[in-house]
Regions:
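Small/aliphatic-rich secondary-structure junction motif
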Residues: 3-55, 78, 86-87
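A short acidic, glycine-rich active-site loop
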Residues: 55-70
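Structural beta-alpha unit
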Residues: 77-112, 152
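Aromatic/hydrophobic pocket-lining residues that form π-stacking "cages" and hydrophobic walls in ligand
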Residues: 22, 75, 99-100, 134
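Short, well-ordered secondary-structure micro-motifs
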Residues: 18, 45-48, 99-101, 124-126
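Residues in the short beta-alpha loop(s) of Rossmann-like NAD(P)-binding domains
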Residues: 39-41, 92, 148
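Gly/Ser-rich helix-loop-strand patches that form or flank binding pockets
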Residues: 104-152
Length: 152
């Protein structure tokens, strides 16, 4: 039913709960997981080289990329432990557009599985601004995973 499943990872517990759900789906349908971490470049641009000099921006970008890689590595380990094929994707862009509209057609995604809210406290006040955007704008099915504890 689902061949290619996109799982956005931001390092939050909710994102990893979504990944656990996606792994189960991938095992059932023999799907491939596409694990994405989007480095929100719009936030980093507040520290642009023009405003603060190149060093601060460069250092912040390096930290963001290293953190992103750690998040993707953890996701790949979880998929690999379940013998599910996964592909890591690291993107420097807007998380909302990347997840909802940019990545799905590029990788023939037919399902997005994501957490209800992420690491940003302001976003968690509502459903999660990224999640709400993806649900509204994505042209593929979206499964939203709540933070309910999973016994597995």
């Amino acid at each position: 039913m689902y061949q290619n499943i996109l799982v956005p990872l931001d390092g939050s517990d909710n994102a990893y709960m979504a990944l656990k759900h996606a792994v189960k789906l991938a095992q059932t349908f023999k799907s491939k997981l596409f694990l994405v971490n989007v480095i929100d470049i719009t936030r980093l641009n507040a520290y642009s080289p023009a405003a603060y000099g190149g060093t601060l921006y460069t250092n912040l970008l390096k930290v963001a990329k290293d953190n992103s890689q750690d998040i993707l590595d953890r996701g790949q380990q979880m998929a690999s432990a379940a013998q599910v094929e996964s592909l890591p994707i690291q993107v420097n862009s807007s998380p909302k557009a990347s997840i909802a509209t940019d990545i799905p057609p590029k990788y023939a995604i037919d399902l997005i599985v994501m957490g209800k809210s992420g690491t940003n406290a302001v976003s968690r006040i509502l459903l999660g601004s990224t999640t709400a955007y993806v649900v509204q704008k994505a042209e593929v099915n979206v499964t939203v995973i709540n933070t309910i504890d999973d016994p597995d």
